[in-house]
């Protein structure tokens, strides 16, 4: 069972390091989000689409009385669609470089577990948002760098 993770208003100490990651299902991929960047895991929020938005931007939702951009995690990582999710979630997380980070929502098919990922086991990815792939138990997960989100475009 997942516990609620709330780092409060101070925000996380963002950066790449070995440690705990939240594993989430995004289409057919399992992705690892740095736990210290995760603020909350919620049942999927109601999303209001924005006309003309890119496919990755599902729209806006309300979180804490404020608008929250919701990104489609499966599209961001190029995952093939998976089965229809039984328990879709929105992961509220800090993204972007530390000096300009902002709160975003990531729409995912399921929150799976918290796991430790050794960065020495990460096989290089694109060097940006997808840090690389690493074995976690019996599966290979895509390790994500939320600091790089939004800097690649």
Regions found by a protein language model. Give the residues of each.
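An acidic, low-aromatic, low-complexity terminal/linker signal
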Residues: 1-153
């Amino acid at each position: 069972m997942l516990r609620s993770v709330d780092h409060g208003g101070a925000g996380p100490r963002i950066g790449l390091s070995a440690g705990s990651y939240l594993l989430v299902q995004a289409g057919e991929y399992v992705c690892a989000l740095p736990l210290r960047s995760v603020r909350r895991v919620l049942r999927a929020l109601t999303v209001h689409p924005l006309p003309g938005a890119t496919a990755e931007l599902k729209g806006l939702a309300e979180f804490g009385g404020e608008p929250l951009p919701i990104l489609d995690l499966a599209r961001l990582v190029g995952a093939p669609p998976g089965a229809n999710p039984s328990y879709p979630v929105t992961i509220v997380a800090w993204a972007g470089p530390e000096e300009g980070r902002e709160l975003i929502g990531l729409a995912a098919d399921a929150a799976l577990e918290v796991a430790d990922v050794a960065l020495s086991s990460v096989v290089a990815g694109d060097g940006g948002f997808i840090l690389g792939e690493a074995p976690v138990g019996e599966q290979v997960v895509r390790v994500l760098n939320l600091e790089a989100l939004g800097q690649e475009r």
